[in-house]
Amino acid sequence: MENEEIPEFLSPKEEIVYWRELAKRLKQSYQEARDELIEFQEGSRELEAELETQLIQAEQRNRDLLGDNQRLKCEVDSLKEKLEHQYAQSYKQVSLLEDELVRARSIKDQLHKYVRELEQANDDLERAKRATIVSLEDFEQRLNQAIERNAFLESELDEKESLLVSVQRLKDEARDLRQELAVRERQTDGIRKSAPSSPTLDCEKTDSSVQASLSLPATPVGKISENSFTSPKGIPNGFGTTPLTPSARISALNIVGDLLRKVGALESKLAACRNFAKDQASRKSYTPANLNSSSSSVLNSSGVKYSHAGHTSFFDKGAVNGYDPPGVLGSRPPSPPGLLPLSV
């Protein structure tokens, strides 16, 4: 009410009315506050008496509680002593159990490690067993293939012996023909001296072709050996010599050319047989590891047939590519007595 603002009055009557109403309100609030004060004093006296009785009762209960508290403290002390004794015993038991647990765990770890080692060793043994079985089966298969190839090689070696005899026979025939040609040339020397010194152009060409054919080597691979057919000394054209007739020269050229082709084919076939024999012997000397590394090439070669046509087959690739295994077949078999060695 103190904070109420006094309004502005237009007339004194309004101001008088305002202050009268305000006095009535203040008087009424004063009466109400006085009644409340009287009522509060009466209630406070009653409350004070009640609180005094409650205080007396609380003091009595406090004395009882203090006695109970003292008794409970004694019981707590006795229980604490018992608890400490029990705790010490339980601590000793727990320590013993922990030590036993540590020992049991260490034994368990050792057993687990031992079991793992046994399992690993068992797995290694099983893998080694499987690998041994596979390698044994592979070795048996390759052994069977080697036996078959050896049988085939033996047949080829027999055929090679027959080819050597044929080649030697053809060489003897070629040597006889060469000697015959030399005799004929010597016989015609006297005729050539008396004949005109200007032969025809055709005779010169035929003579040069005969000399070129006679000077060809016996091997088709281009190697000149001690057993190759060498032509006699070149006959000079003209200068008082008379050449053979064209028909005789052509026939001799054809005969010698056929013989050279046959000998070349036989020597090529013989070279293929020798290379095949060397390759087979080198394959026998390989270890099982080398057999495993070359399994694909050997298996692929099982379907390739050996050719008798004078060219190298699959089994000759080692020698053709420059690979000649050392120690294979020891040394070449000696030629039969009375036969000339064949150069390859």
Swiss-Prot record:
Residues 13-190 form a coiled coil. The lineage of its organism: Eukaryota, Metazoa, Chordata, Craniata, Vertebrata. It is found in: Cytoplasm, Cytoskeleton; Cytoplasm, Cytoskeleton, Microtubule organizing center, Centrosome; Cytoplasm, Cytoskeleton, Spindle. Phosphorylated in mitosis. Keywords: Coiled coil, Cytoplasm, Cytoskeleton, Microtubule, Phosphoprotein, Transport. Residues 333-344 have a biased composition (Pro residues). Pfam families: NUDE_C. Its main location: cytoplasm. GO terms for molecular function: microtubule binding. Belongs to the nudE family. Residues 186-209, 325-344 are annotated as: Disordered. It comes from the Eukaryota. This is Nuclear distribution protein nudE-like 1-B. The keyword Transport applies. Required for organization of the cellular microtubule array and microtubule anchoring at the centrosome. Positively regulates the activity of the minus-end directed microtubule motor protein dynein. May enhance dynein-mediated microtubule sliding by targeting dynein to the microtubule plus end. Positively regulates lysosome peripheral distribution and ruffled border formation in osteoclasts. PANTHER family: NUCLEAR DISTRIBUTION PROTEIN NUDE HOMOLOG 1, NUCLEAR DISTRIBUTION PROTEIN NUDE-LIKE 1. GO terms for cellular component: centrosome; cytoplasm; kinesin complex; kinetochore; microtubule; spindle. The keyword Transcription does not apply. GO terms for biological process: cell migration; centrosome localization; chromosome segregation; establishment of chromosome localization; establishment of mitotic spindle orientation; lysosome localization; microtubule nucleation; mitotic centrosome separation. It comes from Xenopus laevis. The gene is ndel1-b.
